Curated annotation (Swiss-Prot):
Expressed in peritubular interstitial cells of the renal cortex. Isoform 1 is found in the adult brain while isoform 2 is expressed in brains of embryos and young mice (at protein level). The modification Phosphoserine is found at S299, S318, S349. Disruption phenotype: No visible phenotype. It comes from Mus musculus. GO terms for biological process: anoikis; intracellular signal transduction; neutrophil migration; positive regulation of eosinophil chemotaxis; positive regulation of neutrophil chemotaxis; protein phosphorylation; regulation of intrinsic apoptotic signaling pathway. The active site is at D149. Keywords: Apoptosis, ATP-binding, Calmodulin-binding, Cytoplasm, Cytoplasmic vesicle, Kinase, Nucleotide-binding, Phosphoprotein, Serine/threonine-protein kinase, Transferase. This is Death-associated protein kinase 2. One of its GO terms (cellular component) is Golgi apparatus. It holds the Pfam family Pkinase. Residues 292-301 are annotated as: Autoinhibitory domain. InterPro entries: Kinase-like_dom_sf, Prot_kinase_dom, Protein_kinase_ATP_BS, Ser/Thr_kinase_AS.
Length: 370
């Protein structure tokens, strides 16, 4: 008989049983500051999953581990979603020190790793991947769930050994349900991909995800990052000023349709930014005539620069994301007088997930994070 933890009705219940009694725990897939991800096999079915062991914060005064409330929010959101382009939560266990999420195993690695191995890529092929991302986000936004951490590392492939791999959005640690009439502000995410309203500590909504999709698309087509500066301050300033361009060196073979799609996403005013429905209807994603379809087919992605910049980007991100996120927290904390420990937790959580993927988020059938 399964015993659930006794908690108030509005709190998530996790099984208070040893996960090892139901799953054979295998090799480590990744690790981070507050989580370890291991491959596992369900004893009753033989099916493989990924077990994410999240270290619980033991007291409010501590900054080690993840607070129960944040874990519950992530689990609550994952239990609400069921979509082909979103990772699936199978089960949740809890012991004295950890909460263990049993997640879908995604073995195809990151989308950008897959693209970096290709010899050529047309915009038509690129939009097939962007469309899958949009489909997953559309499902979330229909439920008024904002992901708040869309970035290349959180876009995985179910299986890379097929012509058009199936995309899975992962890592719902920062996801949040947007409630009508309830103002939500926070400092979180990976600075390179966060919207101006996050940097400025303004009310947040679904629009922040659309900005991130614009940044992801820009990088996918060129290898260059629109706002990443030489310093932390420059990156944040570029975001708030929406300071970017389509350098001819990187975008000489990019269609005007693709540039228009990006321009309409990288808009500072949230009301003027494309919604998810508008993005899906954009002619670069859904051509309205044969001419537009031909433009996509004949325009190509700058894979040479993509590969060159991607290797550099991966190294730079792994080296600098901790200091960049901490800078974002410190500077904005002074502005709004936030509690230091809680803001740093958000940044540390994001850093954890980046580190966790270094080892083997790529060779598996699911992602290390939800």
């Amino acid at each position: 008989m399964v015993q659930a933890s006794m908690r108030s009705p509005n709190m998530e219940t996790f099984k208070q049983q040893k996960v090892e009694d139901f799953y054979d725990i295998g090799e480590e897939l990744g690790s981070g500051q507050f989580a370890i991800v291991k491959k596992c096999r369900e004893k009753s079915t033989g099916l493989e999953y990924a077990a994410k062991f999240i270290k619980k914060r033991q007291s409010r005064a501590s900054r080690r581990g993840v607070c129960r409330e944040e874990i519950e929010r992530e689990v609550s959101i994952l239990r609400q979603v069921l979509h082909p382009n979103i990772i699936t939560l199978h089960d949740v266990y809890e012991n004295r020190t950890d909460v263990v999420l049993i997640l879908e195993l995604v073995s195809g690695g990151e989308l950008f790793d897959f693209l970096a191995q290709k010899e050529s890529l047309s915009e038509e092929e690129a939009t097939s991947f962007i469309k899958q991302i949009l489909d997953g986000v559309n499902y979330l936004h229909t439920k008024k769930i904002a992901h708040f951490d869309l970035k290349p590392e959180n876009i995985m492939l179910l299986d890379k050994n097929i012509p058009i791999p199936h995309i899975k959005l992962i890592d719902f640690g920062l996801a949040h349900e947007i409630e009508d009439g309830v103002e939500f502000k926070n400092i979180f995410g990976t600075p390179e991909f966060v919207a101006p309203e996050i940097v400025n500590y303004e009310p947040l909504g679904l629009e922040a995800d659309m900005w991130s999709i614009g940044v992801i698309t820009y990088i996918l087509l060129s290898g260059a990052s629109p706002f990443l500066g030489d310093t932390k301050q420059e990156t944040l300033a570029n975001i708030t000023a929406v300071s970017y361009d389509f350098d001819e060196e990187f975008f000489s073979q990019t269609s005007e349709l693709a540039k228009d799609f990006i321009r309409k996403l990288l808009v500072k005013e949230t009301r003027k930014r494309l919604t998810i429905q508008e993005a899906l209807r954009h002619p670069w994603i859904t051509p309205v005539d044969t001419q537009q379809a031909m433009v996509r087919r004949e325009s190509v992605v700058n894979l040479e620069n993509f590969k060159k910049q991607y290797v550099r980007r991966r190294w730079k991100l792994s080296f600098s994301i901790v200091s960049l996120c901490n800078h974002l927290t410190r500077s904005l904390m002074k502005k709004v007088h936030l509690r230091t420990s809680e803001d740093l937790r958000n940044c540390e959580s994001d850093t954890e997930e980046n580190i966790a993927r270094r080892k083997a988020l790529h060779p598996r059938r699911r992602s290390s994070t939800s």
